[in-house]
């Protein structure tokens, strides 16, 4: 039976609003080339993250947790697609309900037939025909945009992970800032220092940070894409590069490539701040210089000792360099720790706490008697 006139307007308004919600979310997520807030996709991400947290939290082995988390980004993508289609489906069903001869069941059958381009149900009347045509076009456009969206994501992912993989040979797995400086000076056992390559490395990571900041704030689902190896993480790699630059400037200001290191630091902490803000963390753009750091002076001395093992040219007394190092690190520490905890990055040295208590993992080093990696 056709719905009475008094009930048509509320049903049509509710249906139209649901369709607009779906269209807006798809447009904001897949088309607009800047960050546009979509509550629907945010809710999907939070729901998927909660589900994975419940499952992964049952395992103490970090490798097992990483295996479980490896599919989280794919689950978010499928969840977004499902949410868009379901919201649009409900919206078009409500739009068709006032014209459905057999009530709400008929409206949902007609909407589903059109939205999923099955075509087995054709309602009578001009207005219902227009609605089903719109539903068919909406379903097709959503699926097409989602498919076209994937190459963009994986291209950005590959650019990100290429530099991470290259850094692992220099900074260890998981990466650590002092290890990066020590191995670079030691030149992986060649006996010839390669510190002259650090300006180029900092320049590459400055560009990397700009690319990641743009891609990961425009397409936040990229934040959930994990690095291929369980002991590797893009967040930890960036943190290691920033720590190496801060250490270099603080301990060896005459030898350090001052301009490339400073530009890398600036680009790196802007990248981390933007990503942390996308994830709804309240991170100040310019932290107070006297805010301090969670690292202790003893941990700083351990880093200095590691660098001295290979004869790194340390030009200042550690006690004198410590305040300068803290002054650099305070700019990015809070954002880096927040993002690392949110994406469950490997608990590398100097990378902050995790949601589940985990012991810090030092970088892997070759066994005695083997050539250094």
Predicted regions and their residues:
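Membrane-water interface of alpha-helical transmembrane segments
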Residues: 5-15, 70, 125-132
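Pore domain of cation channels
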Residues: 18-25, 77-162, 243
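Membrane-interface amphipathic/juxtamembrane segments adjacent to transmembrane helices
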Residues: 31-60, 159-175
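Hydrophobic alpha-helical segments of integral membrane proteins
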Residues: 40-55, 108-115, 119, 134, ...
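Cytosolic juxtamembrane amphipathic/interface segments immediately preceding
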Residues: 58-76
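Non-transmembrane accessory domains of multi-pass membrane transporters/channels
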Residues: 162-238, 243
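Soluble C-terminal extramembrane regulatory/interaction domains of multi-pass membrane proteins
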Residues: 171, 223-226, 230-373
């Amino acid at each position: 039976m056709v719905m009475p006139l008094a009930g048509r307007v509320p049903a049509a308004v509710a249906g139209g609003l649901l369709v607009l919600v779906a269209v807006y979310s798809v447009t904001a997520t897949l088309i607009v080339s800047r960050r546009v807030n979509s509550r629907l996709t945010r809710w999907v991400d939070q729901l998927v993250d909660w589900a994975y947290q419940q499952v992964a939290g049952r395992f103490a082995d970090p490798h097992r947790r990483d295996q479980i988390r490896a599919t989280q980004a794919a689950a978010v993508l499928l969840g977004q697609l499902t949410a868009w289609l379901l919201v649009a489906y409900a919206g078009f069903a409500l739009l068709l309900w006032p014209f459905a001869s057999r009530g709400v069941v008929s409206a949902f059958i007609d909407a589903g037939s059109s939205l999923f381009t099955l075509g087995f149900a054709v309602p009578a009347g001009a207005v219902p025909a227009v609605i089903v045509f719109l539903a068919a076009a909406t379903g097709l456009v959503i699926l097409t945009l989602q498919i076209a969206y994937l190459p963009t994501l994986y291209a950005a992912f590959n650019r990100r992970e290429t530099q991470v993989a290259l850094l692992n040979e220099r900074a260890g797995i998981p990466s650590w800032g002092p290890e990066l400086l020590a191995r670079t000076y030691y030149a992986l056992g060649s006996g010839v220092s390669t510190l002259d390559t650090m300006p180029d490395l900092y320049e590459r990571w400055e560009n990397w940070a700009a690319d990641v900041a743009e891609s990961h704030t425009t397409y936040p689902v990229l934040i959930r894409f994990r690095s291929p190896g369980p002991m590797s993480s893009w967040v930890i790699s960036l943190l290691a590069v920033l720590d190496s630059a801060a250490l270099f400037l603080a301990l060896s200001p005459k030898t350090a490539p001052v301009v490339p290191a400073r530009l890398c630091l600036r680009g790196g902490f802007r990248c981390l701040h933007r990503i942390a803000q996308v994830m709804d963390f309240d991170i100040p753009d310019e932290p107070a210089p006297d805010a301090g750091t969670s690292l202790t002076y003893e941990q700083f001395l351990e880093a200095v000792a590691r660098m001295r093992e290979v004869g790194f040219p340390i030009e200042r007394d550690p006690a004198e360099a410590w305040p300068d190092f803290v002054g650099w690190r305070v700019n990015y520490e809070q954002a880096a720790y927040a993002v690392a905890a949110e994406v469950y990055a490997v608990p590398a040295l100097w990378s902050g706490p995790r949601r589940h208590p985990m012991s810090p993992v030092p970088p892997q080093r070759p066994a005695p008697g083997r050539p250094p990696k």
